[in-house]
């Protein structure tokens, strides 16, 4: 077998890049990733926590990729072993966190949208995930909200309000997926994981939300990466084949 290309890593977003949003990766995609790993070092970076990424990419995800970064790299694994962890609670403190959560819940309570379900705020290790409709809606309701949001700008308006109200906390608000947005301290976006990849001369990042405000934007635009904007898992495979396997 040919040796891996030295000094090069292919780093992937999850939703919309390796999988359809919140869906499991297809067997074909997983087979391709195994083949690609023989050619280059591979890593995955997702905004979700490790349990959600495992649901999508498999329970052995921390071993299937050379690097696995959940919560934008605030929880980091290399070769299946933990190499770093950062906490929002320690960073902000409970008082500021409570102020932010209370305001957000009041805002959602006053929001007039067609349907609401449950789990409007999910507290993760390194971020808050906020969903105006509630995370435990059905897939059909997700699709419906995404269409509604594109017309009514529910998430962008909410983000603008929170950004202004909590400017003193120096937070980033990042819209991702179909129904939610993430809230985390500035610099805790996906570029956070790059500190673990300084030995690589080429970091190829693949993501779908690479526009300003999207949760792949900062890492896609970073001078430390070579950014590739993709539209689907099939597009990711095609771009990787052209880059690394042709």
UniProtKB/Swiss-Prot annotation:
Optimum pH is 7.5. Mg(2+) 2 binds at residues 220, 225. Expressed in roots, stems, leaves, flowers and immature fruits. It is an enzyme of class 5 (isomerase). Overexpression of PMM increases total leaf ascorbate content. Belongs to the eukaryotic PMM family. This is Phosphomannomutase. It comes from Arabidopsis thaliana.
């Amino acid at each position: 077998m040919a040796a891996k290309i030295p000094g090069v890593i292919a780093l992937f977003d999850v939703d919309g890049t390796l999988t359809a949003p919140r869906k499991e990766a297809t067997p074909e995609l997983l087979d391709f990733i195994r083949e690609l790993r023989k050619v280059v070092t591979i890593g995955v970076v997702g905004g979700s926590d490790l349990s959600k990424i495992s649901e999508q990419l498999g329970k052995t995800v921390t071993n299937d990729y050379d690097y696995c970064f959940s919560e934008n790299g605030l929880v980091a694994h290399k070769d299946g072993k933990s190499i770093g962890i950062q906490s929002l609670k320690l960073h902000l403190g409970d008082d500021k966190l409570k102020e932010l959560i209370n305001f957000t819940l009041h805002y959602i309570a006053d929001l007039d949208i067609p349907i609401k379900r449950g789990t409007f705020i999910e507290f993760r290790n390194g971020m808050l995930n906020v969903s105006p409709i509630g995370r435990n809606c059905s897939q059909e309701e997700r699709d419906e909200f995404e269409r509604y949001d594109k017309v009514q700008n529910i998430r962008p308006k909410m983000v603008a309000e929170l950004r202004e109200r909590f400017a003193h906390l120096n937070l980033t608000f990042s819209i991702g997926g179909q129904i939610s947005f993430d809230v985390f301290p500035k610099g805790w976006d996906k570029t956070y994981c790059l500190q673990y990849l300084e030995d690589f001369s080429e970091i190829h990042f693949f993501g779908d939300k690479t526009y300003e405000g999207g949760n792949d934007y900062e890492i896609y635009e970073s001078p430390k990466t070579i950014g590739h904007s993709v539209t689907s898992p099939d597009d990711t495979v095609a771009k990787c084949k052209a880059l690394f396997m042709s």
